[in-house]
Regions:
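Basic, amphipathic N-terminal segments that precede the first structured/catalytic domain
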Residues: 1-34
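A broad, low-specificity signal for short, low-complexity segments enriched in glycine/proline
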Residues: 15-20, 58-62, 119
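Glycine-rich, aromatic-flanked loop segments that form ligand/cofactor-binding clefts
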Residues: 25-63
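Short, well-ordered coil/turn segments that N-cap beta-strands
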Residues: 52-56, 94-96, 122
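Glycine-rich, proline-tolerant flexible connector loops at the mouths of alpha/beta enzymes
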Residues: 67-71, 95-120
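Well-ordered, non-membrane alpha-helical segments in soluble/globular domains
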Residues: 76-87, 110-121
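Conserved, mostly hydrophobic/aromatic
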Residues: 90
């Protein structure tokens, strides 16, 4: 006897968001990422279609974190000392998105330089 999976219909939907603008759209990116649009809860793809695939985002920091687990520092290695190199390594690891976390210790000039270097590396 087959097992019937209970299904529910949700009245709302998750807003769709496009992150990143290509040059044709006035941005600096080579591609954009579209998220959202689901009309069901996460991982319940049998209830309704998932219009946009899940994406992976990796957070990098403007400064090397001193309080991270050795497991993470071993994986990222020396790339953690340079946000641009770290972003490139995150991209090579398969990240669809890179979250750049700036700190209050960054001066406005340093923050601008870090953002520009990460944009140039990705």
């Amino acid at each position: 006897m087959p097992i019937e999976i209970p299904k529910d219909k949700w009245p709302g939907s998750i807003n769709t968001l496009i992150i990143g603008g290509t040059e044709a759209e006035g941005g600096t990116r080579t591609s954009s990422v579209t998220i959202g649009g689901q009309t069901t809860m996460p991982y319940l793809h049998f209830e309704a279609p998932t219009p946009n695939k899940p994406v992976i985002g990796i957070e990098i920091k403007s400064r090397k974190p001193e309080d991270w687990s050795p497991l993470l520092t071993d994986v990222w290695g020396e790339a953690m000392a340079d946000p641009a190199q770290w972003a490139k390594k995150a991209e090579e690891a398969g990240a669809d998105l890179i979250v750049l976390a700036l700190t209050v210790e960054d001066s406005p000039e340093d923050a601008v330089n870090v953002v520009k270097s990460v944009l140039g590396a990705t």
